[in-house]
Amino acid sequence: MAVNVYSTSVTSDNLSRHDMLAWINESLQLNLTKIEQLCSGAAYCQFMDMLFPGSIALKKVKFQAKLEHEYIQNFKILQAGFKRMGVDKIIPVDKLVKGKFQDNFEFVQWFKKFFDANYDGKEYDPVAARQGQETAVAPSLVAPALSKPKKPLGSSTAAPQRPIATQRTTAAPKAGPGMVRKNPGVGNGDDEAAELMQQVKVLKLTVEDLEKERDFYFGKLRNIELICQENEGENDPVLQRIVDILYATDEGFVIPDEGGPQEEQEEY
């Protein structure tokens, strides 16, 4: 069973973000560049496999996860490993999967202390354990949806406006008989770019609204799940029925890996 670590205070033993990334990359032979990339949960799953072989169904971990429901699936695998090894830590999944620096940095600081308290120094080949898989580069929850239009060169909404403005200012000083014919083309390009930018804004607002609605209901389901876990030893048939409904819903939602949720359902 695992040695639990409860201290969350900031001390001189805490690593900086750069040192933390160096430790993770060296230990797991990864190439993470940002703390935010830990939001996929894959690195934590492999660390658990390193600490407690067999505690994690590593073959089911999605190291190339790029979507939030894939992150959640990885954290469900991690939660199952925590439960199996008697780890008391509650994983703030709903916060971690957002990919925000502060939430992920706080959790990895705790995990580093947990790792140090449980690591026995045995040899471990991380690349062979994950069958050569590498983590996805810079996972983002919103950027992939916004980067689909091909005309804007950057992922942000402001970036495409700058070259457009440059085209206007450079065209004005060169106004003359040879250049007047090209102005309509530039104007059409501006109109097309403006229309694409408007579409991007609409899509972004739609995504944000859907994420808020999803997070609202996910938070409620997560709270219900925690209550059920806290009282799971009471053998209450009502609680068991609630748990069955919760995980049946998850199984139907996470379509990409039909085998994973069923096994985790038994572990919970």
Curated annotation (Swiss-Prot):
Residues 154-170 have a biased composition (Polar residues). GO terms for cellular component: cell projection; cell projection membrane; centrosome; ciliary basal body; cortical microtubule cytoskeleton; focal adhesion; Golgi apparatus; microtubule. The modification N-acetylalanine is found at A2. One of its GO terms (biological process) is protein localization to mitotic spindle. PROSITE patterns: CH, EB1_C. Keywords: Acetylation, Cell cycle, Cell division, Cytoplasm, Cytoskeleton, Microtubule, Mitosis, Phosphoprotein. The modification N6-acetyllysine is found at K220. The modification Phosphoserine is found at S155. Residues 185-255 form the EB1 C-terminal domain. Its main location: cytoplasm. Expressed within the midpiece of sperm tail (at protein level). The modification N6-crotonyllysine is found at K66. The keyword Transcription does not apply. GO terms for molecular function: identical protein binding; microtubule plus-end binding; protein serine/threonine kinase binding. It is found in: Cytoplasm, Cytoskeleton; Cytoplasm, Cytoskeleton, Microtubule organizing center, Centrosome; Cytoplasm, Cytoskeleton, Spindle; Cytoplasm, Cytoskeleton, Spindle pole. Residues 220-242 are annotated as: APC-binding. It comes from the Eukaryota. Residues 208-268 are annotated as: DCTN1-binding. Residues 146-180 are annotated as: Disordered. Acetylation at Lys-220 by KAT2B/PCAF promotes dynamic kinetochore-microtubule interactions in early mitosis. Crotonylated by KAT5 during mitosis, promoting astral microtubule plasticity and dynamic connection between astral microtubules and the cortex during mitotic chromosome segregation, thereby ensuring accurate spindle positioning in mitosis. Decrotonylated by HDAC3. Plus-end tracking protein (+TIP) that binds to the plus-end of microtubules and regulates the dynamics of the microtubule cytoskeleton. Recruits other +TIP proteins to microtubules by binding to a conserved Ser-X-Leu-Pro (SXLP) motif in their polypeptide chains. Promotes cytoplasmic microtubule nucleation and elongation. Involved in mitotic spindle positioning by stabilizing microtubules and promoting dynamic connection between astral microtubules and the cortex during mitotic chromosome segregation. Belongs to the MAPRE family. Homodimer. Heterodimer with MAPRE3. Interacts (via C-terminal residues 206-211) with APC (via C-terminal residues 2674-2845); the interaction inhibits association with and bundling of F-actin. Interacts with DCTN1, DIAPH1 and DIAPH2. Interacts with DCTN2, TERF1 and dynein intermediate chain. Interacts with CLASP2, DST, KIF2C and STIM1; probably required for their targeting to the growing microtubule plus ends. Interacts with MTUS2; interaction is direct and probably targets MTUS2 to microtubules. This is Microtubule-associated protein RP/EB family member 1. It comes from Mus musculus (Mouse). The gene is Mapre1.
